[in-house]
UniProtKB/Swiss-Prot annotation:
InterPro entries associated with the record: Preprot_translocase_SecG, SecG/Sec61-beta/Sbh
Listed Pfam families: Sec61_beta
Superkingdom classification of source: Archaea
Organism listed in the record: Thermococcus gammatolerans (strain DSM 15229 / JCM 11827 / EJ3)
UniProt keyword Nucleotide-binding present: no
Family the UniProt entry places it in: Belongs to the SEC61-beta family.
Location within or outside the cell: Cell membrane
Membrane topology, from the record: Single-pass membrane protein
Protein name: Preprotein translocase subunit SecG
Membrane topology (Cytoplasmic): 1-29
Coiled coil start-end: none
Designated gene of the protein: secG
UniProt keyword Lipid biosynthesis, yes or no: no
Amino acid sequence: MAKDKTTLPPTGAGLMRFFDEDTRAIKVSPKGVIAIVLVLIAFEVFLHLFGPSIFG
């Protein structure tokens, strides 16, 4: 009965192939992401403070 068992492929086989593929996407460093978020937060605070006087 033990001879009828089928073996499964290793679980990491698909992961290695996934990370080896190159995609055509915009690549942003972690520092760039943090900078973009900080700029958006500053813009939001600016609009919150001065938006009513600027836009009526």
